[in-house]
Design a protein with these regions (language model features):
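Acidic, surface-exposed loops and disordered segments
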Residues: 1-213
């Protein structure tokens, strides 16, 4: 997929709506993503209203794309639905430990990535907001998330109004281990991060923050 090879975060969007039909098609296609035990331990809250986006913005450090994007998706680890299903069938769900959350978070993040790939292949731009897990309580309150539902990812979505350069990536040799894990030596670290440290924006970051590296 060329959209994956050329993938970059889009933070500026054209003043053009993302149709309900297109969004629902992409969400439905993303449901085909792998899921633990076929339980689909995730839910998605779709925010389109200006009021809703403005309410979410403080939880994302008021980054402009939250209010400027036509659509904001909050993807949640959700084992409430499965728990209630089990309880309503007189079963014991057993979703009361850290493994439960890890399973649900994994499902949610797999769904997020699949949706991102599909959306970008359809010509949309997206931005993954890592701020979701910084202040989850604010998001929980804003979206009225009940017990056993936890926000783990946020995507802003719209038609791109910018085409930024690709972000740098570490060389393949830095992430692949053959047969067993090979621990990192100082020499390997120097090798892996040499290109990143040579980038002008990273040199500027070092200068501004008055640090050695």
């Amino acid at each position: 997929m060329e959209s994956i090879k050329n993938r970059t975060s889009i933070r500026k969007y054209a003043e053009k709506e993302v149709s309900e039909e297109l969004l629902n098609r992409l969400l439905e296609e993303a449901e085909r993503t792998p899921t633990m035990g076929n339980l689909q331990l995730y839910s998605v809250v779709v925010t389109r209203s200006e009021e809703g986006k403005k309410a979410l913005a403080p939880a994302h450090f008021n980054q402009p794309m939250v209010t400027e994007a036509p659509v904001v998706l909050t993807i949640c680890a959700d084992y409430r639905r499965t728990t209630l299903w089990a309880e309503n069938r007189k079963g014991t769900p057993g979703y009361d430990n850290i493994l439960s959350f890890m399973n649900a978070a994994t499902d949610a993040l797999l769904f997020t990535q699949t949706f991102t790939n599909l959306a970008e292949e359809a010509g949309l731009g997206t931005c993954f907001l890592g701020t979701t897990v910084y202040m989850p309580k604010m998001i929980i309150d804003t979206l009225k998330l009940p017990k056993l539902v936890m926000p783990v990812a946020t995507l802003t979505i719209g038609w791109p109004a910018e085409h930024p350069a690709l972000s740098d990536r570490l060389p393949l040799r830095s992430i692949i281990h053959h047969e067993h894990f090979e621990d990192y030596t100082p020499e390997k670290i120097d090798d892996f991060y040499a290109e990143k440290e040579a980038l002008e924006e990273n040199k500027e970051f070092v200068r501004i923050n008055n640090v050695e590296t």
